[in-house]
């Protein structure tokens, strides 16, 4: 009798569970609930580098947003073009063989075109893409080792080709023009680096890996030298924290990347995670990691934002359109901080030289 009652109880539990699941599915359909295709970033590990890849947002081919320039023919890009020459940035993008087609090619088709030089760093060489083969293994525990080898490769082959050296992931979107404005105030021969500054574990703080970080030429030299002299080691698997510790050991300053009114420019998540209040729960690690008090909502982000992380391939093109194409008619930019006097003089002199050429009839 007792065993029959126990069997009935188990049958009741199973039936209840199945009924609950069926009802949940029914309500989802009736209410038109959408499947969340955004990356799952609400993990407990602040150093988890890449979004959970569910395969839903992969695009088959690249898109060329610059193919139709009919609405940009009278656009004045003089300042941006001058900064491109004055503030030279080499970008290297952390990727892997499995991500060249899924992610890296969309970086290549969008923001990477504005780098003075761009390199895609993988564990294996790919001459067609192309990607540099660092001869490492793949996996999160290899990220710092890949980072060290990538910077060593850049130092050996491209040290004189740029003034600043940006590391980004293949799911990071970067606005290079805003980064050049930020860096224009600084001397690349000084030991300094910039990114989204976190505070735990390192006295001066360190830069979030996902939001990307940029080293001055002198900072790059010191970082590479640190491993020649054994002042730093490659034993850690936590890339951004380990690099931050090494920077502090080598007396490389953790710079303040906020804009002139104190708003953050480097962002470790996609825009909506910063802009929408309540998206990131207060128990989330992010709130305790920021070096400067974080702001939630529209005040979170500078109008001259530099980067966003966990950007899937679809959002990569959405950001490209929003940043470089969408404009409200009849508005001039409200927030346009001035350039350093040194840069302004150089631009003015360049324009004078160009005017002289025109007057003399030279092309």
UniProtKB/Swiss-Prot annotation:
Residues 44-55 have a biased composition (Basic and acidic residues). The modification Phosphoserine is found at residue 235. One of its GO terms (molecular function) is glycoprotein-N-acetylgalactosamine 3-beta-galactosyltransferase activity. Its EC number is 2.4.1.122. Residues 56-69 have a biased composition (Polar residues). It is found in: Membrane. Residues 1-6 are cytoplasmic. UDP binds at residues 94, 138-140, 146, 169, 309-310. Pathway: Protein modification; protein glycosylation. Residues 41-72 are annotated as: Disordered. Disulfide bonds join 91-115, 232-246, 300-301. The chain crosses the membrane at residues 7-29. A glycoprotein binds at residue 285. Homodimer; disulfide-linked. Interacts with the C1GALT1C1 chaperone; required for galactosyltransferase activity. Belongs to the glycosyltransferase 31 family. Beta3-Gal-T subfamily. Glycosyltransferase that generates the core 1 O-glycan Gal-beta1-3GalNAc-alpha1-Ser/Thr (T antigen), which is a precursor for many extended O-glycans in glycoproteins. Plays a central role in many processes, such as angiogenesis, thrombopoiesis and kidney homeostasis development. Aberrant O-galactosylation of IgA1 molecules plays a role in the development and progression of IgA nephropathy (IgAN). Genetic interactions of C1GALT1 and ST6GALNAC2 variants influence IgA1 O-glycosylation, disease predisposition, and disease severity, and may contribute to the polygenic nature of IgAN. PANTHER family: BETA1,3-GALACTOSYLTRANSFERASE (PTHR23033), GLYCOPROTEIN-N-ACETYLGALACTOSAMINE 3-BETA-GALACTOSYLTRANSFERASE 1 (PTHR23033:SF13). This is Glycoprotein-N-acetylgalactosamine 3-beta-galactosyltransferase 1.
């Amino acid at each position: 009798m007792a065993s029959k009652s126990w069997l009935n109880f188990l049958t009741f539990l199973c039936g209840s569970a199945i009924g609950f699941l069926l009802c949940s599915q029914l309500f989802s359909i009736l209410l038109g609930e959408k499947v969340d295709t955004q990356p799952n970033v609400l993990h407990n590990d602040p150093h988890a580098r890449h979004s959970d890849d569910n395969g839903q947002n992969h695009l088959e081919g690249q898109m060329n947003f610059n193919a139709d320039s009919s609405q940009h023919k009278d656009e004045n890009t003089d300042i941006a073009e001058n900064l491109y020459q004055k503030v030279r940035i080499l970008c290297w993008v952390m990727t892997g063989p499995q991500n060249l087609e899924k992610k890296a090619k969309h970086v290549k088709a969008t923001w990477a075109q504005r780098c003075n030089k761009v390199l895609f760093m993988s564990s294996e060489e790919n001459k067609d893409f192309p990607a540099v083969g660092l001869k490492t293994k793949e996996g999160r525990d290899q990220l710092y080792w890949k980072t060290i080898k990538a910077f060593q490769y850049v130092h050996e082959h491209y040290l004189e080709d740029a003034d600043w050296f940006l590391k980004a992931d293949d799911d990071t979107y970067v606005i290079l023009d805003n980064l050049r404005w930020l860096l224009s105030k600084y001397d690349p021969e000084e030991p300094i680096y910039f990114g989204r500054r976190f505070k735990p574990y390192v006295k001066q703080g360190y830069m979030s890996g996902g939001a990307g970080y940029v080293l001055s030429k002198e900072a790059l030299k010191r970082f590479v030298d640190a491993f020649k002299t054994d002042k730093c080691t490659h034993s850690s698997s936590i890339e951004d924290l380990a690099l931050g510790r090494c920077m502090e050991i080598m007396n490389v300053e953790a710079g303040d990347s906020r804009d002139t009114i104190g708003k953050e420019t480097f962002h470790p998540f996609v825009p909506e995670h910063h802009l929408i209040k309540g998206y990131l729960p207060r128990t989330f690690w992010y709130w305790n990691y920021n070096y400067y008090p974080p702001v939630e909502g529209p005040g979170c982000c500078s109008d001259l934002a530099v980067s966003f992380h966990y950007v899937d391939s679809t959002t990569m093109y959405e950001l490209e359109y929003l940043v470089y194409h969408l404009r409200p008619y009849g508005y001039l930019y409200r927030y346009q901080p001035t350039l350093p006097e040194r840069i302004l003089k150089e631009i003015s002199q360049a324009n004078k030289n160009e005017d002289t050429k025109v007057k003399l009839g030279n092309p």
